[in-house]
From Swiss-Prot:
Written domain comment of the UniProt record: The N-terminus consists of a long intrinsically disordered tail. The central part contains the coiled-coil multimerization domain (MD or OD). Forms a four-stranded coiled coil structure. The C-terminus constitutes the alpha-helical X domain (XD) that binds to the nucleocapsid (N-RNA complex) and the L polymerase.
Keywords associated with the record: Coiled coil, Phosphoprotein, Viral RNA replication, Virion
PTM-bearing positions, type Phosphoserine: 69, 188, 257, 292, 294, 301, 374
The protein's role, per its UniProt record: Essential cofactor of the RNA polymerase L that plays a central role in the transcription and replication by forming the polymerase complex with RNA polymerase L and recruiting L to the genomic N-RNA template for RNA synthesis. Also plays a central role in the encapsidation of nascent RNA chains by forming the encapsidation complex with the nucleocapsid protein N (N-P complex). Acts as a chaperone for newly synthesized free N protein, so-called N0, allowing encapsidation of nascent RNA chains during replication.
Main location: virion
Region of interest: Interaction with the nucleoprotein: 343-391
Segments forming a coiled coil: 218-245
Family statement: Belongs to the rubulavirus/avulavirus P protein family.
Positions of region (Disordered): 54-98, 145-186
Composition bias, Polar residues: 54-65
Protein's name in the database: Phosphoprotein
Localization in the cell: Virion
């Protein structure tokens, strides 16, 4: 199904709606059953019997009555009005105004006793007539009388306009008032009838001179603003550089923390090594200690058990100090020192000279000393001097 309506179909729908509205507006409005039961003033009900509007009451058709008569009683019923009580006499009313209807849409025909004269007051009848007319005219459009609009003229309204009176429109019922259509009498502000002021012919003209220029002050202010702007940009650049170094500062802090942790670990390991190898506090070489624990001759004087003495060497000898010994000690032979490989150390010292010595003359002197060095002590002296020179 197409959800969009074409323009031609829209125009046909609008035209059909306008025709229906015009049909209902042009049809006459019947004033039957205009007043409800609560709107009738007590004492006036008997005089409202026999209203000519009963002619306009349309009785329902047979089909309509059949649809409504299911489960109900049909139709039209007659009611006879009883005579009024004594003491309610008044002026006779020539004609009644309304017919009465029953409840639930059932039309009730009212018959009047010919012996009964309608009673009531003219004031009540007039009020009922006014209410009837207002209820009927409420739904009928009437041409409104337009209020004459006063044309505004400078100097106040004319004599003809002053004599006119403004007629206010009433609401004539319960409808809303459209308001007054009078235009405002003043079109030039709050002062309604202000007289024009005539120019003064004998006035003295004022002397007019050239206003001094202030371009110099403006230039000075602009130069000052430009200087402040330049300084502000310079400060912003410096702040940007400082903020850019923030990551580098954080990295340096992290590396410093790592170095501190490593240094603490090395110090702990060095303390452990010192505890495990406390060194030689006496300063006695190990060879001498071993020599003191070697075998030697023991002289026992006096009687005693000599079974522990060895029988293999019964001969005693005297040493160079005339001390008795079982066997003379052989002459001590010095062991030849092993020749150490100094080539690796020389290569290391050469690299130290190249990296740590910046002065060419000092570098040449260290190279000459390294070429002449042939012992480990000489190489250690050269290395020590290189470190001192670098510091």
């Amino acid at each position: 199904m197409d959800q969009f309506i074409k323009q031609d179909e829209t125009g046909d729908l609008i035209e059909t709606g306008m025709n229906v509205a015009n049909h209902f507006l042009s049809a006459p409005i019947q004033g039957t059953n205009s007043l409800s039961k609560a709107s009738i003033i007590p004492g006036v009900a008997p005089v409202l019997i026999g209203n000519p509007e009963q002619k306009n009451i349309q009785h329902p058709t047979a089909s309509h009555q059949g649809s409504k008569s299911k489960g109900r009683g049909s139709g039209v019923r007659s009611i006879t009005v009883p005579p009024p009580e004594a003491g309610n006499g008044g002026t006779q009313i020539p004609e009644p105004l309304f017919a009465q209807t029953g409840q639930g849409g059932i039309v009730t025909t009212v018959h009047q006793d010919p012996t009964i004269q309608p009673t009531g007051s003219y004031r009540s009848v007039e009020l009922a007539k006014i209410g009837k007319e207002r209820m009927i005219n409420r739904f009928v459009e009437k041409p409104r009388t337009s209020t004459p609009v006063t044309e505004f003229k400078r100097g106040g309204p004319g004599a003809a306009a002053q004599g006119q009176t403004i007629q206010e429109e009433g609401i004539d019922g319960n409808g809303a008032s459209a308001g007054s259509k009078e235009r405002s009498g003043s079109l030039s502000g709050a002062t309604l009838y202000a007289h024009l002021s005539l120019p003064q012919q004998d006035s003295t003209p004022a002397n007019v001179g050239i206003a001094p220029q202030s371009a110099t002050s403006a230039n000075e202010i602009m130069d000052l603003l430009r200087g402040m702007d330049a300084r502000l940009q310079h400060l912003e650049q410096k702040v940007d550089k400082v903020l850019a170094q923030g990551s580098m500062v954080t990295q340096i802090k992290n590396e410093l923390s790592t170095v501190k942790t490593t240094l603490a670990t090395i110090e702990g390991m060095m303390a452990t090594v010192k505890i495990m190898d406390p060194g030689n506090p006496t300063g006695v070489p190990v060879d001498e200690l071993r020599r003191s624990f070697s075998d030697h001759v023991t002289i026992v004087s006096g009687p005693g058990d000599v079974s522990f003495s060895s029988s293999e060497e019964p001969t005693l000898y005297l040493d160079e100090l005339a001390r008795p010994v079982s066997k003379p000690r052989p002459a001590k032979q010095t062991k030849p020192q092993p020749v150490k490989d100094l080539a690796g150390r020389k290569v290391m010292i050469t690299k130290m000279i190249t990296d740590c010595v910046a002065n060419p003359q000092m570098k040449q002197a260290f190279e000459q000393r390294l070429a002449k060095a042939s012992t480990e002590d000489a190489l250690n002296d050269i290395k020590r001097d290189i470190i001192r020179n670098a510091i």
